[in-house]
């Protein structure tokens, strides 16, 4: 099968062996794959896949099931989207059937490629790990990102007011239209976020020099969940604030989690999140789609840090 590899900072559409479909797995003919920052890092040689995972780029995809392994309840022809440790940017992918969800009602097959990674990330980190309670206030750094877009909608759906930090006035307006209460543009004074706080939960893909600010913004017994290091891996912290406020600093990753952990997470998504699409309370937010032949342009678009929502790579538009 053809698949997208990251080679010396470039992407190449190359031939790869077709993976076997074993017990409990399904084979998906891929329609589209969502781009994530991990793909940028892997392409640059900075983020290798976990042991045993495919070297092919792509942590999420959508498509049509073409083969079902023994023990799986899926059917050939089912339209689905899936969370992957790698391999999504290919003509087909084999995945644990428990890491697959149906394309939600009212969502196209191409749009569905933008859902698994961001909604799994937000549900895991905000609702499970940080144990967000009704009415608690949330701060989302990089609020116009794919993860931010999902988090804003979930906060609104579950009755939690949220605020954002973003890169431009246009992206702030985008977040407010999705349901954010407000926020700040990072080129302005980030300290002004204190006017909206303190915050019970902070979802932080930035780290770096945002760390000291987060401690100032965190409420008593607040939870600061670190999911990325776009701003750097080093920070200077006033540990007295951690003690005084009883702050929980929670580091979190998803890609390297084991199969059972992801299966349990997807069971929760199926029960608590996926029905909200049919109710019109959640919707995919696509910034732009690119055909696979323009993969370099798609990666450049994501790397520009100017998009609002998700960038999606279309692998086979005949399936849609």
Listing of model-derived features with the role each one plays in the protein:
Residues 41, 79-142:
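NAD(P)H dinucleotide-binding glycine-rich loop of Rossmann-like/cofactor-binding domains
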Residues 158, 166, 209-281, 314-320:
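Glycine-rich phosphate-binding loop and adjacent beta-alpha segment
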Residues 140, 156-210, 262-264:
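Adenosine-nucleotide cofactor-binding segment
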Residues 88-91, 166-174, 234-239:
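Short, glycine/polar-rich helix-capping loops at beta-to-alpha or helix-loop-helix junctions
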Residues 18-34, 46-87:
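Glycine-rich beta-strand-centered segment in the early N-terminal region that forms part
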